[in-house]
Amino acid sequence: MKNRKYDLAAFMMAVLVGAAVLFGCGESSGAVSKEEPLTVYLWENSLIKNLVPYIHEQLPDQDIEFIVGNNDTDLYSYMEEHGELPDVITVRRFSGTDAQDLQPYLMDFCGYDVVSRYYSYALQYYKNSDNEIQWLPVCGLPQTIIANKTLFDQYGIKIPSNYQEYAEACQQFYENGIKPYSLDLAEDWSAHEVIQAGAIGEFTSLDGIEWRSGAETSSREVKFDDGLWKRIFSETSRFLKDSHLGKDDILVNADIAYQTFVEGKAAMFHGYPALMQQLQTQMDAQLICIPYFSQTSEEAFVYMTPSLNIAFNKDLEKDQEKLETALDVLDCMISEEGQRLIANGRCVISLNTNVPTMMQDISGLEDEMKSNSIYIRYSAQKSFSASLEAIHGLLSGEMDEAQAYDAFRSAMNAEDTEEKAVVNFDREYSIALNDKNGRDAASSILTTVRVENNAQLAIAPYYYFTASIYRGECTSSRVALMTAKSSDTSLYFAKINGEQVWKLVENYLDHTEDEFSITNKYELPILSGMKITVQKEENGFLLKDIAVDQEKIDKEKEYSILLTDDTRSILEKTTPGCRIKRLPDMTLSSAWTAFMEKGQQPLAPEDYIEVEK
């Protein structure tokens, strides 16, 4: 077993002398306690498809259950209130303020050597008010301006290397009838980015760093430095004007902004390098990344979003074997291959001293990467809606800089409105596997949505269901968190015969998509209106039987079936030409939430699966 813990004094001395203890991912340090698996919640389902197979490959003898959560720490607060905080939790949108109610229940990483493998800048905002590090970022994704270099060259416009040149380039494109910057300002994340990236010189100044440190550890009202924030909104306003962004851009969503850039009607867009590579395949143009420029100096910075932030349940320290397994999982995540898989490509900023940054195919950021000129996004939940309100006020002309700052500050410090309960659950259903390898909470949710949409059958991947249904009153927002809202799926309706149902289920069990396939009991699908019997084999599961109404499925009979994005895709392959109808304005999460908002009880879970050994 690896000795991963050491006292804080020794750790600080190691940091001072520049020592770092390096560990690989592949060596397993011990099995999980036999009673229960290690539960790891990943904030979106792409991580289930990309990362989980790699971790299982590295740690084949360890009992680990991966479940998709949500990009919201309130999910984990809800689970903790009912005594079910998972062993390992992750989110992308994160600030210390949002996670304060979890602070008593999370482990401090400061006593473990994993902290010594991080660059100091990566952890500067991760210490809480007790000087503990309870969350760690796992690799970063650079969010930059994406420039159409071919368009720049066509009009003889220089690729900017400072803010003044950026403003001049925007003006030249505007005079030539080309939109300088296509930005999806209908989206909260883009409004959020404009404030921090447009005034990035202020956020990276000593005043900005001091404010950020205080904001991350604030337990109540976030204090604002008026001098700093007046400068921030002055520079934000200037950035919007210099970029020729105005009232019409309030309604520009991600699809519109993307298409405008693809069609060559705009010179610049924004996004991660992986998006730039995707754009490159669609455009007959050379693309290049541009960093965000300080308006107060010649400096430029890469605006970075951690791909995920991870925390451990404090109770892990009471079970050394389970803790070692959790640390093994973390080792896998921060390994070179783990970071590449998390970032879904090669373009990733490593935050760890023993793993190189992987930006080989991206040009335009070389100087900033070499000098570690990286700004980590501030991501308090309230800051997104606050940014949207302030930016829309500036764009519409309804607010000047001072009013926009006042609106932002007020929104950040507004007291949370007490949300009223919409349903009082009279029963409790667990998301954990039952003794037949089914998930009662997931079954209840899927069955409720199926019946509400008048379908006889339904099949869905397990990773669309996140939390137990707890007895008692529940608000609408927490009802929504019982499904993977951050990785939601559309719903589809089809009519197929029993033989086609068999092929659909059989192929789902065999299906490999993006290197993800069902290899263990935790990954089995959720079904409703039917019961399947499967046999465990060395590399997966074999379908043995399907029963409907306790009788073997009729291969000739037609059945209506409710599908998700993934199961629809499989049906299109197994039954080409099958008519599949997308249910309008409906997702799994919205359908479930809407039904519960009526105040009715969910339907009981079904006995939908049996695993033969």
Give, region by region, the residue ranges found by the protein language model:
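Catalytic centers of hydrolytic enzymes
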Residues: 418-613
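C-terminal capping/gating helix-and-loop segments adjacent to ligand/active sites or protein-protein/ligand interfaces
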Residues: 46-47, 65, 304, 343-417
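Extracytoplasmic/periplasmic substrate-recognition and gating elements
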Residues: 57, 280-344
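Extracytoplasmic/periplasmic solute-binding protein
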Residues: 134-137, 167-221
